[in-house]
Regions:
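Iron-sulfur (Fe-S) cluster-binding segments and ferredoxin-like electron-carrier domains
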Residues: 26-32, 58-59, 288-294, 333-371
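Short cysteine clusters
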Residues: 17, 21-24, 264, 279, ...
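Conserved alpha-helical substructure of the radical SAM core
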Residues: 1-136
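Processing junctions and N-termini across compartments
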Residues: 11, 15-18, 42, 321-324, ...
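Short Fe-S-cluster ligation motifs
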Residues: 69-88, 313, 355-403
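Radical SAM enzyme [4Fe-4S]-AdoMet core and its adjacent flexible, acidic
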Residues: 30-40, 51-60, 65, 111, ...
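Short hydrophobic/aromatic beta-strand element in the GNAT-like acyltransferase core
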Residues: 10, 272, 327
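C-terminal accessory region of radical SAM enzymes
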Residues: 225-257, 286-332, 336-337, 347, ...
Length: 403
């Protein structure tokens, strides 16, 4: 079928990261080792070496794309119609060639955004990226409170992030902040918004955890209660009104509390594409781990234009012809596109099913059962599993579980 021109490319240039966030959307099978919050160092001692960059389900044995390969991908994306590129990971600053990739994006006339934890982004690197043409930075924070933030990240990172935010502003680069919201930090939403004001962010995303990758593994610990979600929504709405014209605030609800599915990335293969560290091209960043039965083409063997227009993986759920009932007869089908394919796969083991978040899905009971379990256990302390990294030096030594 015919395809729209893509609007944005997410360039996951590495899955290496100095942090260990338990809600990371990266694949969980890069390493088989696990580490609980009660002993985060145990997992680090068995963390994967830097070369272990291919997940168990991958169809190739390649390592990360080279500088030259990424530069070619960027040129092909621009030729395909892409207007914006996000450099993500993992932690994209783990790649020393990041300024070269940003420069390639500028030469291709793409708007570039760095999605980062900020670790490693000192004043020298900030200015190098600015001079290469970087347009904006999205800086992640785990909380406004340093102790809580460092426990969530599994690393001493919060104080460094504050310095990074100041460096970004001083360099004249547009700054947005991203707070990933979950049960352990959602009650500090007012303080997070206050921190964004202090740091001078122009945009703030208050994003409830979406349950893929490590977040799916830790769902029972991370999913907030309905009372927490409703209270947070009211706080975010009030802040959006109060700060109108100064800070753009976006509050992203957790899917499970919705009754209709989100139009995930404006539909499968419609406007967005992701290239992961080893060169697989995905309709969304979680597709290869959530739907392993699909074969995803690689930029080392096919050009981006062919993959976007012709590949089986991009066409499998593009449009509406693939839809089962009740989606096929739904008047919303060209608005929500049946919801999220990865969520359908994770919850029902069939990516072609209606997203079970939808109130009309025959599988909505799965989501309702998850919510019942969350509310029945909301007063109990749980440990989570930290994300394990392909390369994971860290000085974090806390051994206390979060209550």
């Amino acid at each position: 079928m015919s395809a729209h021109r893509p609007y944005a490319l997410l360039a996951e240039i590495t899955h290496r990261c100095p942090l260990h966030c338990p809600y990371c959307s990266n694949p969980t099978d890069y390493c088989r080792a696990t580490a609980s919050v009660a002993d985060p160092e145990a997992g680090r001692r068995s963390a994967c070496p830097t070369t272990a960059l291919t997940p168990a389900h991958a169809k190739t044995n390649y390592g990360e794309l080279s500088t030259e390969e990424w530069q070619r991908v960027i040129r092909e994306a621009a030729a395909l119609g892409v207007l914006q590129i996000g450099f993500s990971g993992g932690e994209p600053l783990a790649r020393r060639d990041l300024p070269e990739l940003v420069r390639a994006a500028r030469e291709a006339k793409l708007y570039s955004n760095l999605i980062t934890s900020g670790i490693g982004l000192d004043d020298t690197r900030v200015r190098a990226l600015r001079d290469a043409g970087l347009d904006s930075v999205q800086l992640s924070f785990q909380s406004d409170d340093a102790d809580l933030a460092d426990k969530i990240a599994g690393a001493h990172a919060h104080e460094r992030k504050l310095d990074v935010a100041a460096n970004i502003r001083a360099a004249g680069i547009a700054l947005s902040l991203n707070f990933v919201i979950h049960r352990r930090n959602i009650d500090r939403l007012p303080q997070m918004i206050e921190l964004a004001e202090v740091l001078g962010a122009g945009r703030v995303e208050l994003a409830n955890v979406q349950f893929y990758g490590w977040a799916f593994l830790n769902r029972a610990v991370l999913l907030p209660t309905r009372e927490q979600v409703d209270r947070a929504r009211n706080i975010a709405t009030a802040a959006k009104t109060r700060l109108a014209g100064m800070i753009d605030i976006f509050y992203v609800l957790p899917d499970y509390y919705e009754t209709r599915p989100k139009p995930c990335l404006s539909g499968w293969g419609q406007r967005y594409l992701t290239v992961n560290p080893i060169g697989d091209v995905l309709p969304c960043s979680t597709a290869s781990s959530a739907i392993p039965e699909l074969r995803f083409e690689n930029v080392r063997t096919r050009d981006l234009d062919w993959i976007w227009r012709e590949s089986e993986s991009f066409n499998r759920f593009r449009g509406t012809q693939w839809m089962p009932e009740p989606c096929r007869s739904c008047p919303q089908k060209e608005i929500d596109f049946g919801g999220c394919r990865c969520q359908a796969a994770l919850l029902t083991e069939n990516a072609a099913n209606t997203d079970p978040v939808c109130e009309f899905s025959p599988n909505r009971a799965i989501v309702d059962e998850v919510l019942r379990n969350v509310h029945s256990s909301r007063n109990h302390a749980h440990d989570w599993t930290y994300r394990i990294n392909p390369s994971a030096p860290s000085s974090f030594e806390s051994s206390r579980a979060l209550a």
